[in-house]
């Protein structure tokens, strides 16, 4: 009963903190941390200690999985270099620097134990991402922070494990640590990918959305547990499974399953994140009490925590600054090279497109200047492959893939050019590296043989709580002062391009329908397709693009703010009325009269039902074609991830409304 009461009170605290966070302009995590600390110091509340495995093995995998599902895989690929620097290199450098300083200022602390403490203080917390997103900073900053948060926990735990082993056994080498880390990541990659693919195949066969959601809750653990038993990182495996699910899910899973899962997972994330910070605050009193019982000074711990916390910020800034300089040079080099090669690339793309369409022989020589290296060398290699004897279908497929690669590279260059990471953005990234509950959970994994373990635990929780409070509360002020690039509405050009994309997809469905009807009704060729081209183009275009309308005015952070369920349905009905009603009798069938005898009324009702069913079928075909077109464009990176996500959500909601059945 006591546990049940605690759980209920905790849920109410999470709900209350989330509800009032906007009013007080403080992140819910910080409010819950403060509540936990206050409650933990009440005389009626005993000292609380939570097993670290509950957080590291029970809470972190689903949280990281949920974040990975929601991240844009194309943006994650683009920012992979930044993520590797921050999630791997920065963690190692932070552990080494902090460990070296602690060795000097804490008597009797060996280098191995000091590096272990440094590893504990290295991983960042996801609360910075939620704060930055609420402030509206650019999506590129959010992607960098999200990618770092997905992987740095695993890196820190590997460094912590290696340092602890070195301190107790003294048989660890640098090469051994590197090999162990590489093996851990490779195992996690294999297990995570396999679990992601297998569970998608399983979920595609599930017909109930609730059952699918239940199965989705097992995925992070299905990935993490085997990976851990095979010597890999369970956290990385959960992340990889999430990336696979997020990338392939829209093509495999029905929209009602995805919508139900997203809503349920959002609630689960809210509860799990809230409990993490409540638990962190509640444990504060027990750690302080243990330190007081063992003798070390609380004041000394506070000063050391201030020193360690300052080092985390300085080291992060020292790594972020050269990383940004390198990224800027890389982006400029890409843009310059692409501009120099623009004419040749366009010629190559045109020839490959012609091969893909079958307009020219697939073995035709394609002129190219081979004096350049880099991209040109890779394209030349692809060209030589195209010239090898092969089937026309395979050549056309390779040519199409080459065009996709060029379009993807062009979109990458535009992305780096339009959303640069400068000093202003770097200041936000550096200041957003606050520590959190993972730091405390990792510190609790220190073995009992660690010298002054409770004292080191106190330093860890002071650094985590202090960085959350100081950096979390001042991050809005930093954003206001440095003025980084902010996330804005989709521009008119992108909106128009998405509009055209959806219209083209709808035209494809209409053309297919005309081809099918040509076989059954000779002489009716092109009737429906002509409507989109010639008959009041404004109304059909608006209807076809209903799922992308208001991208520039309604979107903030990729969330759908409204539904226009009649959009694609209106277009389908319009086409059926004009296409099937080309003669008077067909017109009467499409728009039956509402007067006449009972027999005529019965025929009219049947005609209306038939017309409604035909409209529904065409609408669903259009929606699915538009979704495929959006997903293809998203994989190439042709549009911003937020615009693609918003348009997909609108299509999903429209399809759900068309396919839903009353219970």
For each predicted feature, which ranges?
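Long, amphipathic alpha-helical stalk/connector segments used for oligomerization, subunit docking
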Residues: 324, 485-597
């Amino acid at each position: 009963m006591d546990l049940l009461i605690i759980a209920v009170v905790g849920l109410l605290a999470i709900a209350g903190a989330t509800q009032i966070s906007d009013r007080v302009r403080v992140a819910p995590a910080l409010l819950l941390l403060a509540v936990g600390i206050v409650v933990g110091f009440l005389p009626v509340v005993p000292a609380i200690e939570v097993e670290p495995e509950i957080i590291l093995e029970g809470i972190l995998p689903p949280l990281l999985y949920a974040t990975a599902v929601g991240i844009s895989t194309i943006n994650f690929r683009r920012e992979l270099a930044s993520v590797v620097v921050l999630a791997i290199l920065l963690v190692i450098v932070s552990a080494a620097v902090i460990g070296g300083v602690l060795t000097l200022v804490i008597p009797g602390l060996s280098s191995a134990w000091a590096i272990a403490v440094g590893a504990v203080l290295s991983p960042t917390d996801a609360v910075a991402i939620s704060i930055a997103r609420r402030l509206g900073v650019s999506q590129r900053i959010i992607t960098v922070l999200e990618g770092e948060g997905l992987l740095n926990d695993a890196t820190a735990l590997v460094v912590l494990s290696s340092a602890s082993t070195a301190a107790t056994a003294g048989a660890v080498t640098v090469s051994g640590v590197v090999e162990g880390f590489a093996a851990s990541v490779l195992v996690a990659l294999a297990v995570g990918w396999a679990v992601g693919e297998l569970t998608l195949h399983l979920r595609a066969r599930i017909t109930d959305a609730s059952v699918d959601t239940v199965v989705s809750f097992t995925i992070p653990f299905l990935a993490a547990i085997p990976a851990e038993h095979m010597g890999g990182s369970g956290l990385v495996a959960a992340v990889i499974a999430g990336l696979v699910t997020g990338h392939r899910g829209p093509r495999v899973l029905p929209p009602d399953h995805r919508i139900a899962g997203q809503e349920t997972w959002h609630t689960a994330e809210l509860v799990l994140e809230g409990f993490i910070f409540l638990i962190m605050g509640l444990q504060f009193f027990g750690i302080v009490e243990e330190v007081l019982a063992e003798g070390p000074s609380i004041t000394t711990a506070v000063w050391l925590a201030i020193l360690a916390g300052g080092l985390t910020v300085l080291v992060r800034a020292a790594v972020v600054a050269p990383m940004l300089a390198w990224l800027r040079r890389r982006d400029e080099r890409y843009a310059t090279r692409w501009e120099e090669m623009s004419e040749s690339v366009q010629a190559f793309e045109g020839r490959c497109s012609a091969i893909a369409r079958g307009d020219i022989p697939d073995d035709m020589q394609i002129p190219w200047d081979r004096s350049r290296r880099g991209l040109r060398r890779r394209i030349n290699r692809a060209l030589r492959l195209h010239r090898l004897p092969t089937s026309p279908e395979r050549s056309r497929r390779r040519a199409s893939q080459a065009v996709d690669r060029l379009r993807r590279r062009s979109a990458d260059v535009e992305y780096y050019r339009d959303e640069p990471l400068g000093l202003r953005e770097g200041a936000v990234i550096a200041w957003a590296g606050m520590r959190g509950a993972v730091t405390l959970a990792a510190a609790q994994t220190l073995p009992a043989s660690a010298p002054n373990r409770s004292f080191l635990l106190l330093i860890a929780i002071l650094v985590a709580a202090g960085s959350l409070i100081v950096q979390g509360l001042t991050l809005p002020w930093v954003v206001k002062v440095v003025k980084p690039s902010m996330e804005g509405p989709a521009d008119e050009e992108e909106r128009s391009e998405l509009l055209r994309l959806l219209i083209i997809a709808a035209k494809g469905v209409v053309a297919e329908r005309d081809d099918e009807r040509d076989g059954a009704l000779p002489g009716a060729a092109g009737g429906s397709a002509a409507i989109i081209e010639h008959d009041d183009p404004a109304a059909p275009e608006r209807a076809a693009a209903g799922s992308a309308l208001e991208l520039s005015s309604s979107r903030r952070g990729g969330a759908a703010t409204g539904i226009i369920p009649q959009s694609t349905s209106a277009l389908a009905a319009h086409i059926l009325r004009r296409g099937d009603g080309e003669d008077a009798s067909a017109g009467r069938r499409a728009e039956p009269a509402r007067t006449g005898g009972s027999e005529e009324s019965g025929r009219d009702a049947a005609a209306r039902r038939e017309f409604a069913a035909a409209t529904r079928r065409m609408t669903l075909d259009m929606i699915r074609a538009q979704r495929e077109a959006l997903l293809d464009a998203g994989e190439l990176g042709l549009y911003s991830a937020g615009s693609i996500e918003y348009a997909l959500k609108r299509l999903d909601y429209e399809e759900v409304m068309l396919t839903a059945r009353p219970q």
